[in-house]
Curated annotation (Swiss-Prot):
InterPro entries: HATPase_C_sf, MORC_ATPase, Morc_S5. This is Protein MICRORCHIDIA 3. Residues 542-589 form a coiled coil. GO terms for cellular component: nucleus. The lineage of its organism: Eukaryota, Viridiplantae, Streptophyta, Embryophyta, Tracheophyta. Its cofactor is Mg(2+); Mn(2+). The gene is MORC3. GO terms for molecular function: ATP binding; ATP hydrolysis activity; DNA binding; endonuclease activity; RNA binding. Exhibits ATPase activity. Binds DNA/RNA in a non-specific manner and exhibits endonuclease activity. Probably involved in DNA repair. Involved in RNA-directed DNA methylation (RdDM) as a component of the RdDM machinery and required for gene silencing. May also be involved in the regulation of chromatin architecture to maintain gene silencing. Keywords: ATP-binding, Chromatin regulator, Coiled coil, DNA damage, DNA repair, DNA-binding, Endonuclease, Hydrolase, Nuclease, Nucleotide-binding, Nucleus, RNA-binding, RNA-mediated gene silencing. It comes from Arabidopsis thaliana. Its EC number is 3.6.-.-.
């Protein structure tokens, strides 16, 4: 929204001829630029309405929780995406700038000088935005991304993402279009809108033409409007002086964009949603389950170490899988350290590539679906498909099999589905007929792949007899039930023993683990076939896993009840104090 007089939303004129900037730097975009603009607008100032450029510290919202920000929240409904995907939206904008020469996007945390609060910074060296481009970026519902290679399409990604992370953001950008160099600053502040009681979304912006020897302000309405927008920015942004504001543009270089998001949201406990202290090389979402449970089962610890769990709370893990193809000359730099891209398809075991054509015609090339077992199988039961759209991860580890079903355990796939449309938040796909056909096809792929390869990892295909040619045994040992061994036994240590337990163990070249089931031959093998014994072993193994799961759930329940008990005790203590205070008041009366 242009800072014209009809849109500015204020009638304040700021005195730019202050002594706060005594530096003689007259470089492009330097402090001298403000002095030249101050002298340009001196004749437009009205003494009775003049305000000093150095304003009081910005005011904060009473409520700092995103979910309790108020029903008049300026961002459209549907902005419910978690913080990590909101950050990914801003990374997408930088990736789209690769075609304009961008080589990096930096994501970091800084401290605001005014109140020492944390803020998020995103900076890229792309082509930047001219004044018109910045207005379109910060207005609702506009998108100039019509290319088949760019990721965004709805036009609200920047606004919804920044507002999901914090109440306020300020954008600095420099660009050159048609031989004209410009630099612009725009402020999208929910705090400003609420505190000043604005009925409309007022977005103050200032633009400067840096093509000439001395930078000049670009005036759309009047010099007073330009000055009023600057005053709003100085009052409600993290920067109180013109010099501080201009230094941010200098940090960009000749072209690029910097976005600073501040007044970050808090959770219900009054703690920042984003954690910057758990890992100095990462930005993390708070995982409450880690802090609630004192005793965690070993299997759960192993699951939490896998990237399928890690990417839900770690921005570095999420960013490493965010794009399918590796960048040639572009880096995502998180807190000063480049993110190493990762594709789980590169480490699948027994991998297969299946071609899928979603269209009835054969004019378009079929989509390749890579599928295989994770390297931790069968130790971890992680499964699902990482589905990308235009190189961007939309659904990580999408489980197409039924919940609780063992079929497909450990099977992971990767595909780029450009033939279906993502939802507005890029966290799912639209439920179209093409999507439903893809889901049905993926279920079939998992089923066929599982039936072909599951025996390699000691799983048994339901309804199919066990392969007698691959049934082997180990030396004599005390009979046990449901013994699990993640490592294969060397072939030279395996032999058949009449008195020992019969097991089913498959160990092929690509497998590193197997399931061993042992039964007592004297008590349990009479009148039972090998297939029945195998099925019984599987049932015992599944029951064991159910008990482990129940144990974890019960531990979580105990932890929650203990927490509720502490809260109840605290409430009782407060009520007791109130009752005692009332009793004293009545006694005094």
């Amino acid at each position: 929204m242009a800072p014209e007089s009809k849109n500015a939303g204020v009638s304040v004129v700021v005195n730019l001829d202050s002594d706060s900037d005594s530096d003689n730097d007259d470089g492009v975009g330097g402090r001298g630029a403000f002095r030249s603009m101050a002298s340009l607008m001196d004749k437009h100032q009205v003494p009775s309405t003049t305000a000093d450029a150095t304003v009081a510290p910005r005011e904060n919202l009473e409520c700092r929780s995103f979910w309790k920000a108020g029903e008049n929240f300026v961002i459209p409904t549907g902005v419910t995406n978690p913080a990590a995907p909101a950050i990914a939206e801003l990374i997408d904008n930088a990736v789209d700038e690769i075609q304009n020469g961008a080589t990096f996007v930096k994501i970091d945390k800084i401290n605001i000088v005014k109140d020492n609060s944390p803020a998020l910074v995103f900076q890229d060296d792309g082509g930047g935005m001219d004044p018109d481009g910045l207005r379109k970026c910060m207005s609702l519902g506009y998108s100039s991304k019509k290319s088949n290679t760019t990721i965004g399409q709805y036009g609200n990604g920047f606004k919804t993402s920044t507002m999901r992370l914090g109440a306020d953001d300020i954008v600095f950008t420099r660009s050159t279009r048609g031989g004209k160099s410009t630099q612009s600053v725009g402020l999208l502040s929910y705090t400003f809108l609420r505190k000043t009681g604005q009925d409309d979304v007022v977005v103050p912006m200032i633009d400067i033409d840096t093509s000439k020897e001395r930078p000049q302000p670009i005036i759309y309405g009047s010099a007073e409007d330009w000055a009023a927008s600057l005053e709003i920015i100085l009052k409600w942004s993290p920067f109180s002086t013109e010099g501080e504001l201009w230094q941010q543009l200098e940090d960009i270089g000749t072209h690029g964009t910097k976005v600073i998001i501040y007044n970050l949201w808090l959770n219900d406990e009054g703690i920042y949603e984003l954690s910057f202290h758990d890992d100095n090389e990462d930005i993390r979402l708070r995982d409450e389950s880690v802090h609630d449970s004192k005793r965690v089962h070993h299997n759960l610890l192993e699951l939490r170490s896998h990237i399928s769990y890690h990417l839900r709370y770690s921005l570095r893990a999420y960013a490493s899988m965010l794009y399918l193809k590796r960048f040639n000359n572009f880096k995502i730099i998180l807190r000063g350290i480049p993110v190493e891209q990762f594709n789980i398809a590169d480490e699948l075991r027994l991998p297969e590539t299946i071609k899928y054509n979603p269209h009835t015609t054969k004019e378009k090339a079929p989509t390749e679906i890579k599928v295989g077992f994770i390297k931790e199988a069968p130790k971890l039961a992680v499964c699902g498909f990482n589905v990308y759209h235009k190189n961007r991860l939309i659904r990580p580890f999408w489980k197409v099999t039924m919940g609780g079903e063992r079929r497909g355990s450990g099977v992971v796939g990767v595909l780029e589905a450009n033939f279906i449309e993502p939802a507005h938040d890029k966290q799912d796909f639209e439920r179209s007929s093409l999507f439903q056909r893809l889901e049905a096809r993926l279920k079939k792929i998992v089923s066929n792949y599982w039936n072909t390869h599951c025996h390699v990892f000691g799983y048994c295909t339901y309804g199919m007899p066990a392969d007698k040619s691959k049934r082997i045994a180990i030396p004599d040992q005390p009979p046990t039930v449901n013994t699990f061994n993640p490592l294969p036994l060397p072939s030279d240590e395996i032999r058949v023993s009449q008195g020992g337990p019969i097991i089913r163990e498959i160990s092929l070249s690509n497998a590193t683990s197997s399931r061993i089931a042992a039964v007592d031959t004297e008590n349990n093998l009479v009148g039972k076939s090998a297939h029945e014994i195998s099925e019984e072993n599987i049932q015992l193994f599944m029951r064991c896993e159910e008990y482990v799961k129940k144990e974890t759930e019960l531990e979580q329940t105990v932890s929650n009840l203990a927490k509720e008990l502490e809260e109840t005790k605290s409430k009782c203590a407060r009520l007791a104090l109130l009752v005692d205070a009332k009793r004293r008041e009545m006694q005094q009366v």
